Amino acid sequence: SRTGNRKKQSRTSNQKNGYALKLEQSYGGARDNTVTIKNSGSKQSVLTSSGYQITTSSGDSNYTQIVNLEGDIVLKNLDETKEPLGIKLGTGSKLLDTESARNLIPNGGFSVKEADGNKYIYGSYANAAGKAADGNITLLHDYKGNEPINSGSKSAALDLDGHTYTYTGKTAAINVNYPNVEFTVKNGKVVATDETTDGAHLIGAPNESNMNNRSLTLDGVELTVPGDVCGIITNGTETGNKVTLKNSTLNVENGFGIYFPSSGKVTIDNSVINAKHAGVQVCSGSLTIVGETAITVTGQPQEKTDADGPIADGAAVSIVNRDGYKKLETVNIENGVFNSAADVEAVRAYSFNNADKTENEWSEAGNVVEVTGGSFSSNIAENIVNSDMQATTTSGGETRFVVGKTAVENAIQALKSGDKITFKKVADDAVITVPENVEITNSTGKDITVNGDTFEVGETTTAHVWDTEYTIDKEATCTEDGSKSIHCTTPGCTAKKDVQIIPAAHKLENVAEQQATCKAEGIKAHQHCTVCGKDFIDGVEKTVDELKITKLAHTYVDGKCTVCGESDSNYNPGTMNPEQMIPSQPNDTNKPDNRMDNPETGDGSNLTLPIIILSVSGIGLSGIFIYLRKRKCNR
């Protein structure tokens, strides 16, 4: 171990691309060592240069140099307008990972956790990958330089952590350079600057006998290469290779997206490929495309002049049955948006003769390729399509061929007034709702239902959008039926359906019974129509007279009604009413006296009381009735 104590001291190099402090061992003198750069003073130490401020190296990758910085040490660029380059961690050199140490590695820096439990920072991915105990490496800062991302001999994952890795070299930005390795790059951007540089290689060295079983996964990565090259490429002589594009974007706007001639598997999941000559081309192995994938190819087909390498056929997805290549397994296109240039098939499946460099029909394509979903810029060969939902849409002058339930539903939702859709196949259980004023053609060979309407085979018409509630077209009256129907909601459209009769009917109100009295007639309980004025009982029309309840008789006492007080016009005060007859019993102590006070009259004469005694011989006295008759006397 060595300690450099720079107490109260700063160092400056005025040389072009010079360094302030060099801690490098020669190859012959290489050994494991620890170097500590320490400022034990109270004042800040400053290391200034135009190149790296500190350079380090163990001299041999078989040996390790651990670099520590302690105290207040600042790195500066000789040109104050530029950021310092920091520490250059060379071969076998690493820096204990601390927050302050990370700031000393402004260009890149790769952090790993090693077997001793500590985290260290390396200057290159290759050095870091060989030491990572758990296979996880994290990029600390944006990187720009000529060192590619080489996987190394161990399976690992590089987390770009939102940073950009800019490769200025001329081979490939990413290289899975060992067999039996699974390598993942995630969460960031990888950019190649040279037009001769491929994006990623899974290609063995020419003298390597076994470079099989290599895997590359890009997860959440945007990989961009500028030239007429390949975004990702494998070797046709190898087996068991895997390429996975997940939530990623591959930009090769002047070249090929993915060229996969080796056996193995390609998976494109919810990713974007932008290319010129072909989006993804497989000549062996298998291919699966799922999720919201979008592949766009802008170029026209080009004549093939050599027997090897990718074919510029202009297809978004290209499946080539090629002489001398390993067997094609299965190709499944389940969803996505696939675009090729005008008059170029978006999905092509064909045979290619390497000898005469010609394309031929591939009769077995339907046994290998299956398209079950997606939206395509061109029609797809019937022998490779397998879906009971197929349609063609025309919108804004662009025609698309849509396959699969999800893709057809998405295409319908995107339609606008004036657009067109032709249904080629419709599942029996499909529920189809098309926006208003869209022209619909039924080319399915059977009747279909759209927006609740039946469309016959071959019929072309504009789709109605029906209201969810009935509209009253004619009000019913007491004597005439009315009608209601479902109307089309499209402005200016007068179409209607499901017309229903509203039966003629009275608008009845219940009228309660009015009981009869001795003064007025009553009215029976009934129903009264507020429109026509007619009255009904139990649905039978009644006249006014039929509703009447006869008046009750008066109950008179002493010439007056005990209910309403009305006088009896027939009442004669001099006549004994039957009600005034009071029967007398022999022992009735309450019987009236035989005498009545005689009221005085004007002439002073007396009232005489006649007494009549009736007797029945042999039977005895059976009763005595006393009749009192008042006689008016004058005083």
Predicted features by range, described:
Residues S1-E83, L89-N107, D134, N150-D159, ...:
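Surface-exposed loop/turn motifs in large extracellular/passenger domains
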Residues L78, G135-A156, L160-A172, G227-D228, ...:
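N-terminal extracellular ligand-recognition/capping segment immediately after the signal peptide
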Residues S100-K113, V402-A411, T454-W466, V499-K507, ...:
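Low-complexity, Pro/Thr/Ser/Gly/Ala-rich linker/spacer regions in secreted
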Residues G109-L140, G397-K424:
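Acidic Gly/Asp/Thr-rich repetitive segments characteristic of extracellular carbohydrate-active
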Residues A128, L139, L158, I289, ...:
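Extracellular/surface recognition and adhesion modules
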Residues T555-G604:
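C-terminal low-complexity, Ser/Thr- and acidic/Pro-rich disordered "stalk" regions positioned immediately N-terminal
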Residues S605-V616:
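Short, hydrophobic alpha-helical membrane anchors of single-pass surface/secreted proteins
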Residues V616-R635:
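C-terminal membrane-anchoring or membrane-association module
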